[in-house]
From Swiss-Prot:
Belongs to the universal ribosomal protein uL22 family. The keyword RNA-binding applies. This is Large ribosomal subunit protein uL22. One of its GO terms (molecular function) is rRNA binding. GO terms for biological process: translation. InterPro entries: Ribosomal_uL22 (IPR001063), Ribosomal_uL22_bac/chlpt-type (IPR005727), Ribosomal_uL22_bac/org-type (IPR047867), Ribosomal_uL22_sf (IPR036394). Part of the 50S ribosomal subunit. GO terms for cellular component: cytosolic large ribosomal subunit. This protein binds specifically to 23S rRNA; its binding is stimulated by other ribosomal proteins, e.g. L4, L17, and L20. It is important during the early stages of 50S assembly. It makes multiple contacts with different domains of the 23S rRNA in the assembled 50S subunit and ribosome. The globular domain of the protein is located near the polypeptide exit tunnel on the outside of the subunit, while an extended beta-hairpin is found that lines the wall of the exit tunnel in the center of the 70S ribosome. The gene is rplV.
Length: 111
């Protein structure tokens, strides 16, 4: 098993989970193709994390990418940046800028 993470990514976890659904239960090559054609910002971030996990497998254990499959994709909520928006009569409303922690675990088939 080879793991790669990206933390504090400025993508809402709800939207990132949609992009993560594109790569679940696929081989690494298929997932890369799916994410390369995805127009979501989260898809670009997940592709970078997937490439990092593949590089970990290739450099540490000399495993070919054709033999790898995705074992787990996890999108967790990170901390929120809190901003304020002015409202009528001197009021204000909170705006929450959400962040995500992305984790991709790849391994050999049949593992």
């Amino acid at each position: 098993m080879f793991k790669a993470t990206a933390r504090y990514i400025r993508v809402q976890p709800r939207k990132a989970r949609l992009a993560a659904g594109l790569m679940r239960n696929r081989s690494v090559v298929e997932a890369q193709q799916q994410l390369s054609f995805s127009q979501m910002k989260a898809g670009r971030c997940l592709k970078k994390v997937l490439d990092s996990a593949i590089a970990n497998a290739e450099s540490n254990e000399n495993i070919k990418r054709e033999n790898l499959c995705i074992l787990e994709v996890r999108v967790d909520a990170g901390p929120m940046f809190k901003r304020m928006k002015s409202k009528s009569r001197g009021g204000r409303a909170p705006i929450l800028k959400r962040t995500s922690h992305l984790t991709v675990i790849v391994g050999e088939r049949g593992q």
